[in-house]
């Protein structure tokens, strides 16, 4: 008699994805972030569900409903802070996951990579809309500034912005629709993530060497299930340290002031995970140019498979590529720092240089390094 996990229609899918899946024997801890993102997503959906039970998406009561959750609901404070800091953990894992894909050449799996880029954009949209919901000062002004960017689109811009707002400014209609979208998107993300996995399992995982590992596979369970559990425990430990000891560390104090359309905060800035994008956006003096640079800073990921010149799959054996990769990481950290600084003399120039370097690294320097490494191999 066949094992039920191999014959049952539903169990068979789970078995082929998480139990008998042939996995490379040499994948490092950088391959843990996929499962950690799954853990983050489930955690965000669960905490978000419980928050939605007490939240009201009305401009007059939204701010006080969040206060009510923190003060009066049983363990509401921990649910709220797990959700807010869970978003930060989500983005840490996301950026690590994308960085791993870049470093080890996982972008050669085109479908998986492109669906990953769609996932990244969807998660960013979800996080942005979630940040608007508490209806604090930074929520309101962040929503105003970011939605206003669409008015830079020629001809249809103004109509488009007013259509998204549901009026002539960010108001009740905007908050209600953002809540609706923020609720539905995580489920859409879950569906896209399943397609992401489906395409990944068509080819099998990549590995640090960038060489096919078909000759050396091990079963996913127990080897990688136990490894993923360890990763998840470390993730939850880090999250709970943040939630219980420094819940407001990554937040903005301005968001504890209720939204006031008549009073603009001195520095309108997004959450830390969008600061690099904000820095690229504001380093270009022209509005439309800034919006295009902002969009392209993420969409450039789609072009990376086309810009791959190296004969090696991975950067593991490419010293030049490695140097450039880590310089790119340093550049992104610089952009993140600049995004949090006021728009004044030294910061503007640093931001512009870092923005130029960001695109230069990806479009020019890394492909050139790949070509040089090919030459070195022949030499």
Curated annotation (Swiss-Prot):
It holds the Pfam family Cytochrom_B_C. The chain crosses the membrane at residues 33-53, 77-98, 113-133, 178-198, 226-246, 288-308, 320-340, 347-367. Binds 2 heme b groups non-covalently. Heme b b562 binds at residues 83, 182. Its cofactor is heme b. It is a multi-pass membrane protein. GO terms for biological process: mitochondrial electron transport, ubiquinol to cytochrome c. GO terms for molecular function: metal ion binding; ubiquinol-cytochrome-c reductase activity. A ubiquinone binds at residue 201. Its main location: mitochondrion. PROSITE patterns: CYTB_CTER, CYTB_NTER. One of its GO terms (cellular component) is respiratory chain complex III. The keyword Metal-binding applies. Keywords: Electron transport, Heme, Iron, Membrane, Metal-binding, Mitochondrion, Mitochondrion inner membrane, Respiratory chain, Transmembrane, Transmembrane helix, Transport, Ubiquinone. Heme b b566 binds at residues 97, 196. It is found in: Mitochondrion inner membrane. InterPro entries: Cyt_b/b6_C (IPR005798), Cyt_b/b6_C_sf (IPR036150), Cyt_b/b6_N (IPR005797), Cytb/b6-like_sf (IPR027387), Cytochrome_b (IPR030689), Cytochrome_b_C_euk/bac (IPR048260), Cytochrome_b_N_euk/bac (IPR048259), Di-haem_cyt_TM (IPR016174). Heme 1 (or BL or b562) is low-potential and absorbs at about 562 nm, and heme 2 (or BH or b566) is high-potential and absorbs at about 566 nm. Belongs to the cytochrome b family. Component of the ubiquinol-cytochrome c reductase complex (complex III or cytochrome b-c1 complex) that is part of the mitochondrial respiratory chain. The b-c1 complex mediates electron transfer from ubiquinol to cytochrome c. Contributes to the generation of a proton gradient across the mitochondrial membrane that is then used for ATP synthesis. The cytochrome bc1 complex contains 11 subunits: 3 respiratory subunits (MT-CYB, CYC1 and UQCRFS1), 2 core proteins (UQCRC1 and UQCRC2) and 6 low-molecular weight proteins (UQCRH/QCR6, UQCRB/QCR7, UQCRQ/QCR8, UQCR10/QCR9, UQCR11/QCR10 and a cleavage product of UQCRFS1). This cytochrome bc1 complex then forms a dimer. This is Cytochrome b. It comes from Bison bonasus. The gene is MT-CYB.
């Amino acid at each position: 008699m066949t094992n039920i996990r191999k014959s049952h229609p539903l169990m068979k899918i789970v078995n082929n994805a998480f139990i008998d899946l042939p996995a490379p024997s040499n994948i490092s801890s950088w391959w843990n972030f996929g499962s950690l993102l799954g853990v983050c997503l489930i955690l965000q959906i669960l905490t978000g569900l419980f928050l939605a039970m007490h939240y009201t998406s009305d401009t007059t009561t939204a701010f006080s409903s969040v206060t009510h959750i923190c003060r009066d609901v049983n363990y509401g404070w921990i649910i709220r802070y797990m959700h807010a800091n869970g978003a930060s953990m989500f983005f840490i894992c996301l950026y690590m996951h994308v960085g791993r894909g870049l470093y080890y050449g996982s972008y050669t799996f085109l479908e998986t990579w492109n669906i990953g880029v769609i996932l990244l954009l969807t998660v960013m949209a979800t996080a942005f809309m979630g940040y608007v919901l508490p209806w604090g000062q930074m929520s309101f002004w962040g929503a105003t500034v970011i939605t206003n960017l669409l008015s830079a689109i020629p001809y249809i811009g103004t109509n488009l912005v007013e259509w998204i707002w549901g009026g002539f400014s960010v108001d009740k209609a905007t908050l209600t629709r953002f809540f609706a979208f923020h609720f539905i998107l995580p489920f859409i993300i879950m569906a896209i993530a399943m397609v992401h996995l489906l395409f990944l399992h068509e080819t099998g995982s990549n590995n640090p060497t960038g060489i096919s590992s078909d000759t050396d596979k091990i079963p996913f369970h127990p080897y990688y299930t136990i490894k993923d559990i360890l990763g998840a425990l470390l993730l939850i430990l880090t999250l709970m340290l943040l939630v219980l000891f420094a819940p407001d560390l990554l937040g903005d104090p301005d968001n504890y002031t209720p939204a006031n359309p008549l009073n603009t905060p001195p520095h309108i800035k997004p959450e830390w995970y969008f600061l690099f994008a904000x820095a690229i956006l504001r380093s270009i003096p022209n509005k439309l140019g800034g919006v295009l640079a902002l969009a392209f800073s993420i969409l450039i990921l789609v072009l990376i498979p086309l810009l791959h010149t190296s004969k090696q799959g991975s950067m593991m054996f490419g010293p030049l590529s490695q140097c450039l990769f880590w310089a790119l990481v340093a550049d992104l950290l610089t952009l993140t720092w600049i995004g949090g600084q006021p728009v004044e003399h030294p910061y503007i120039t640093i931001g512009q240089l870092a923005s130029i370097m960001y695109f230069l690294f990806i479009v020019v320097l890394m492909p050139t390094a790949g070509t040089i490494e090919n030459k070195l191999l022949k030499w």
